[in-house]
Amino acid sequence: MAADVPGSPLAKNATTEEALAWYKSQYEELEQELKEFQQSSKELEAELEKDLDAADKRERALQQKAEGLSYEVEEWKRKYKESKSEANAAQSALEKEITALRETNRTLQLKLRDIEVANDDFERQARNTSSSLEDLESKYNVAIERAVMMEEEIKIGEQERERLRVEAQRLREELSDLKIEAEILQSKLRKHQARGHLTQITTTIAPAPASPLSTASSPLVSTPPDTKSLSTIDTLSEVQDPPSPPMSDASLGKGLRASRSTPVKQTASRPGGCRTPKTSISKSAAAKSSAQATHKANQSFSENNITPKPKPLSSSTSSQSNRPSNGRFNTNSYPMVRTPSSRPSGARAAERPRAPVHRIPPSNSLTHIRTLTAQMQKLEARVHSARSKLPATAQTPPKQSPRFSGGIGGLAATVAMRGKKQRGVGASTSSLNLLDDDNASDISGTHSNPDFRSSTLNLSKHIPRLSTSGVSRIAFGPLPIRHPASAAASTTSTSTATATNVDSEVSRPSSRASSSGYGRPISRADSHSTAASGYMPSSSSRPISRTSLPGHGTRTPVGSWPRSSGNLSAYGHGPAHSQASISYSTAEEDELTDDGQRELRSKTTPARRRTGTLSARDAPDHHHTGIPIPGSGGNRRQSGSSSASRSSVTGSLSLRRQSNAAALGHGHGHNAGYGHGHGTVPGGTTVRKVVDLGETY
């Protein structure tokens, strides 16, 4: 504005009018500017008011909005706090739950581990149980099979036992018939000789002293006893009365028995069975008796298809020399061993005192007998060599019985010797009836051989007896051996008999005389026999098993060794004499080789009494049989100790049957085994009365 204003009027050449006029013009301009300024100020004020109102409105709205937002903020804060607290609570709860779950998981893991361990144990136990069950099942099956096999074997044994019993009964009946026939023949021979053929009896010769090595007679030919007066016979009948030949003679066939019938009748016809000097008789009588014997021998040989081969007579001479001249036996000598080497030589026999020069003319039957004697010697040697090759069993030998303390061949220390005239009663183990004196005298009156007569009585009065208990009595091992008499021969001659009788033993009752098993006392008869004979148990033998026999593949159960019924027992009579007793039971009879073997046992040849009669089970290898075997005495002659020799003679016998016959063939005499008493018949003959002690199971 200062620029628009004209120069100041106060300029030196400006007049008052100009100055006025300038002032006036300035004023008007200023006023105009004021009005415009006022107007513009009003407009601006109005606009500012409007703006202020609008700002107020906006402020109020914003304030309301801020208040609402603050409220919302508060709400959200509250909600946030609530949700946060809830989240914290949930988090803490979840954390606690997680902790519990972790603990639970750990516990479950431990339990699972224990369960797995237990499961492993259970699985192991299950495997063990299954394997044990399989083993048990296999063992059970094996046991069942074994039981079935044993039942079959027992059935077979029962059948064999029944067959043997029937066979033994049949053989016993035939033996009784043959004894009756022999009795008739002997009576006829005595009547024939009583007519004057034996009237030239010369003076007797004193018997020579007994030899310690010659204690057995010939197995087939028993020489007559030495001659003594009838008074001496009556007083010393136990010395002079000869028993029958050893039962091993029964191992021959019918032909051998028939051929021996003549010596039986000749010797039995002499008074008292005593040896008489050989006298000269008429040739016609000798021819007649020899013709009868030859006819019977030839007939028997034709039945058995046996052709006798003539041999020199030296064999019978040497065999006869084995008999002691005085009829006694030395019990202190070596126990008799039935081996061919035990026979005395012929030179020793030649040194013996002989009978008077008067002799009976030789007969064909005697020649046959001597020939058969030589054949038997050869067969015995062959059988011994054959049996030595048989396999032996693995069975331990039986233990020695503590009942006897005496040495071999000597008497027991606790046994008192009896006098020569004391006559013991042979204890028969079978259930026979006692025979009174009248019956014994009546029956024995028809016999001059008391041994033969007593055997006939005892067998004729035999009553078969079976076990009524209904339960089989089984032996649990080999029976102890009472006598060592046949220790050397029994291992070869009777080893096969063991296997044969095994089947029959399972259900066989034991007898008192053969009781040497467990829990059974020894019988009185066997104790006396052992004491009198001086035997002692032996444990040097082994029984043979059935597997070693041909045709028998099955093995017999261990411990079932049979006890047989035929048992020998004896009482002591003097230093070396005993009387034998034998019994037979139907259910316990061992099998003979054939039908004719009992004929040989029935037709006994009188010979000297042999000492120490044994039960067959008393021998080392005879646990299984009751057939008698040789007694004491050293180097006694063999008497058919091999069962194979009978097989060679008869031709078709099996080894099993031979073993039973071998057991039968080891006795002292055929009729050794019957109780004897005293008695006399007309003619001064000493008669033994049969007495039986009976048997109790």
UniProtKB/Swiss-Prot annotation:
Gene designation per UniProt: ro-11
Matching PANTHER family: NUCLEAR DISTRIBUTION PROTEIN NUDE HOMOLOG, NUCLEAR DISTRIBUTION PROTEIN NUDE HOMOLOG 1
Function: Required for nuclear migration within hyphae during vegetative growth.
Bias kind Polar residues: ranges: 226-238, 259-269, 327-344
Similarity field: Belongs to the nudE family.
A Pfam family assignment: NUDE_C
Ranges of Gly residues composition bias in the record: 670-682
Gene Ontology BP annotations: centrosome localization; chromosome segregation; establishment of chromosome localization; establishment of mitotic spindle orientation; microtubule nucleation; vesicle transport along microtubule
Region ranges (Disordered): 204-364, 388-409, 486-686
Protein name per Swiss-Prot or TrEMBL: Nuclear distribution protein nudE homolog 1
Organism name: Neurospora crassa (strain ATCC 24698 / 74-OR23-1A / CBS 708.71 / DSM 1257 / FGSC 987)
Coiled coil: 11-195
Positions with biased composition (Low complexity): 204-225, 278-297, 312-326, 486-500, 507-516, 529-548, 635-665
